Amino acid sequence: MPKEQQEVVVLGSPHISTSATATTINMPEISTPDHVVWSLFNTLFMNFCCLGFVAYAYSVKSRDRKMVGDTTGAQAFASTAKCLNISSLFFTILTAIVVIVVCAIR
């Protein structure tokens, strides 16, 4: 089979050849939440038995692991931080309810 060559004519201004520069950005496929904001909130306002502070420490470790590229480690630290945040929130709300009930009974 003979190869056909086609010519394309562009109307308008003359064509100036320039070299094109390509930039590639490697983006991570999965974004792992590190729960830093939630941990900071729990540290400042709902720090039941220092659970908020420990959750903040695990959140920072998760963020560090994510920056290094260790997604498995980041997910493990983020999961621990999430559990600690939920525990801190639950126990702080439970303590507040108990205090309100005890004060209301007196």
UniProtKB/Swiss-Prot annotation:
The chain crosses the membrane at residues 85-105. Keywords: Antiviral defense, Cell membrane, Immunity, Innate immunity, Lipoprotein, Lysosome, Membrane, Osteogenesis, Palmitate, Transmembrane, Transmembrane helix. Palmitoylation on membrane-proximal cysteines controls clustering in membrane compartments and antiviral activity. Its main location: membrane. Pfam families: CD225. One of its GO terms (biological process) is negative regulation of cell population proliferation. GO terms for cellular component: early endosome; lysosomal membrane; plasma membrane; protein-containing complex. Residues 36-56 dip into the membrane without crossing it. It is found in: Cell membrane; Lysosome membrane. It comes from the Eukaryota. Residues 1-35, 57-84 are cytoplasmic. It is a single-pass membrane protein. Residues 106 are extracellular. InterPro entries: CD225/Dispanin_fam, IFITM_antiviral_protein. Predominantly expressed in nascent primordial germ cells, as well as in gonadal germ cells. A lipid is attached at residues 49-50, 83 (S-palmitoyl cysteine). Interacts with CD81. Part of a complex composed of CD19, CR2/CD21, CD81 and IFITM1/CD225 in the membrane of mature B-cells. Interacts with CAV1; this interaction enhances the ability of CAV1 in inhibiting ERK activation. PANTHER family: INTERFERON INDUCED TRANSMEMBRANE PROTEIN 7-RELATED (PTHR13999:SF13), INTERFERON INDUCIBLE TRANSMEMBRANE PROTEIN (PTHR13999). IFN-induced antiviral protein which inhibits the entry of viruses to the host cell cytoplasm, permitting endocytosis, but preventing subsequent viral fusion and release of viral contents into the cytosol. Active against multiple viruses, including influenza A virus, SARS coronavirus (SARS-CoV), Marburg virus (MARV), Ebola virus (EBOV), Dengue virus (DNV) and West Nile virus (WNV). Can inhibit: influenza virus hemagglutinin protein-mediated viral entry, MARV and EBOV GP1,2-mediated viral entry and SARS-CoV S protein-mediated viral entry. Belongs to the CD225/Dispanin family. This is Interferon-induced transmembrane protein 1.
